């Protein structure tokens, strides 16, 4: 079989996906990959850290379940799941189980963390040490920082919130330079060319790696305490063309509570077409919020009878079309011939080196299978064929590629490439692999999988 060296390259506009928040539980990456057919650049998970509060480390809505609450952010601290790392932390629990799951599946961790601005340097150092093994991840610290709903904005002035961001950033960079920081603040002040709270956040803007805003084309921000009816006030809807400044959008959607399921599709697709048509390419990426939602902000909504069950929404099919648009998906470039053994490098979903196997097809297959024997049995692999991605976990010896040929049928003879990449098998980079271990992971592939492609039924 002919094999080639390949390189993952960035999309023109990257897609990240929210997975778990105050509005929904984390959904495992095996399920999401099966539903959507391809990975994202990154997966955003949302946690909080308020170690001085008497309710800590409980999730605050559980600690205060007998308290009369009329707004989602009226609790003593933010109702995200608690970040259980830090000093004397437990790396066997959340968010680390989720972070490892995300990276095994060839995606970057985007950790959103709301944090008490009074935490000590020692506590920040401990969090930074937690993040060292997770490669080229992103940290969105104290997002929507120019708002007034999160607990950290009620414990400090905006200048103090900004100064805390700078302090955290500087400590983080000394310990975990592999982590890129995201400063998520407001956009331009209405009728002005100045950034909201520009004076207070000037130093934070200079220090951060990435600047972003959150933008909902429609949102019922009274959820879950108010239904978005025409006569109610706690919902808004924006014209998509008002979002026209260079930015990373860290939370994006149109709320089905406001638009309904069909206008939600139209609004999101209109915005994506606008992004594609813009000659300045002002948007580097956006995070769709989110996969499964307790309200109507999800590709699925949570079944109220069973939170392990998601109810697919019409937006999911439209979102799959967006994911498969060349503008929004990473590229795979062929870099010349290869011979075994080959060392594969995993840097990120936008910068990794793999191999491609040429597969000659007579027509659409009836069976399309791969068997992983010998040293490959313990490999952790992400694979792509005919536009669809598949995951092979360590210990798995068989993968069925036929789903790639259900919708993407081959009408005649064709050569397709089976692309193979090797993200970290444990979800963490290996410090024994050399000086660049913070940002790269290596795996030597010594043999190829045994392929079975058949074009007629057995009987």
For each feature predicted by the language model, list its residue ranges.
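Beta-strand-rich ligand-recognition modules
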Residues: 377-448
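Substrate-binding cleft of secreted/luminal carbohydrate-active enzymes
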Residues: 2-32, 47-50, 246-350, 421-436, ...
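Aromatic- and acid-rich polysaccharide-binding/catalytic face
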Residues: 45-48, 111, 197-228, 248, ...
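A short beta-strand element within beta-rich, extracytoplasmic domains
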Residues: 336-348, 352-381, 416-420
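Glycoside hydrolase catalytic-domain groove-lining segments
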Residues: 78, 216-259
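N-terminal carbohydrate-binding/catalytic regions of secreted carbohydrate-active enzymes
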Residues: 16-133, 294, 375
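Aromatic-lined carbohydrate-recognition surfaces of secreted/lumenal glycan-active proteins
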Residues: 165, 169-196, 244-257, 283-293
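Active-site groove signature of glycoside hydrolases
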Residues: 128-158, 181-188
